């Protein structure tokens, strides 16, 4: 499974260009997407999940062209874990996942089998009778990961999955993504370099709608050597000026 993005542009009605003639190949395995807020990462994921139609350019998923006639076929191949998880707070974990399985059109017996499997894989089996509103942020992310995997997608997209989590939960989520990437392509979007160093062999660095770098983490670190420094100052205006540069 691979994703090919060619000359992709997304321009909004207010004139803002969120993605600017971008090209990218996402291979099988876990692929990192690194960039600051406003770099265009979320817009790219909205395109890849068929939520947003690009202004121009092409995207293909396993040789299937992104077009209105193919969206339903593409959606069956994609699982998505958004940054914010808000899944039916009055339902238990199992009830929530059973409902998501129904929405995905999964046969009852098969749905139960998959739910049991993924609850065990994500260490949620002992919490399946808890209401969603009783779960910690990390547990909610894990439930979100299960719902994204229920229909057995070939391409899993995760948006900032470790943001706001404690160190132990962050490591758990990262390990799960590495595990699930053995059977599918995973796009891991984050602004935390440590997460990508622990999980990805390849990544892309995004800024202002363009990809500044694509390649391995080791190559990126080699390129950065001698070009990174730390400056401590109490002058806020100077700090902002340095940040702009």
Q: Which residue stretches match the model-derived regions?
A:
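A short, flexible loop at the N-terminus of ABC-type nucleotide-binding domains that lies
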Residues: 1-5, 9-21, 27, 68-70
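Catalytic Walker B motif of ABC-type/P-loop ATPase nucleotide-binding domains
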Residues: 156-159
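Helix-to-loop junction immediately C-terminal to a conserved catalytic motif
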Residues: 49
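Conserved ABC ATPase "signature" region
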Residues: 98, 102, 109-127
